C-alpha cells in the first residue's frame, strides 16, 4: 500500500483508496486458518464511507497482494468487496488473538473496542 498526498500523485503510481488507512495487521501463520494469508487495513472516515476494516488476500509467501482484477491494476480495484466491517468513526488499532478474533479500537469520544469474528 503506497499512499501519498494528492499533490504528489503525478509523481507516483499510487493506489487511490477511498479511505484513510490508519492501522495494518497481518496475522501470524499459527492463527485461525480463516485469516491465513490476509492483511487487514483499518481506516478512518473517508469521502465515501465511515471508518471500517478491509481484508485483502496475500500470496502464499505473504509478500504481495493476491487481488483478482480484470487488469491486475491496483488503481482500479473494487475495494467494497474486501470490506469486512464498517460504521466505525476511525479504526485506530487492531489486534488478532489465537482464536482468530479481531479486536478493533474505534477512536470515538470516549473510545470503544469491538470484536470481529470469522464467519463459519
Range-by-range predicted roles:
Residues 1-81, 99, 111, 118-119:
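Beta-propeller domain segments
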Residues 106, 117-120:
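C-terminal alpha-helix/helix-terminus motif
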Residues 20, 87-90, 109:
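Beta-rich catalytic cores
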Residues 84:
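Hydrophobic residues at beta-strand termini and immediately following loops
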Residues 41, 103-106:
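Residue position within the beta-strands of beta-propeller blades
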Amino acid at each position: 500500500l503506497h499512499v501519498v498526498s494528492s499533490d504528489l500523485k503525478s509523481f507516483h503510481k499510487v493506489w487511490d483508496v477511498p479511505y484513510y488507512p490508519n492501522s495494518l495487521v497481518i496475522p501470524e501463520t499459527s492463527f485461525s486458518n480463516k485469516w491465513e494469508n490476509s492483511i487487514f487495513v483499518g481506516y478512518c472516515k473517508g469521502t465515501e464511507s465511515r471508518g471500517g476494516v478491509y481484508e485483502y488476500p496475500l500470496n502464499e509467501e505473504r509478500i504481495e497482494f493476491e487481488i483478482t482484477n480484470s487488469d491486475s491494476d491496483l488503481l482500479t480495484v473494487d475495494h467494497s468487496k474486501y470490506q469486512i466491517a464498517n460504521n466505525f468513526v476511525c479504526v485506530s488499532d487492531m489486534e488478532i488473538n489465537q482464536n482468530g478474533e479481531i479486536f478493533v479500537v474505534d477512536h470515538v469520544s470516549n473510545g470503544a473496542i469491538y470484536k470481529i469474528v470469522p464467519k463459519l
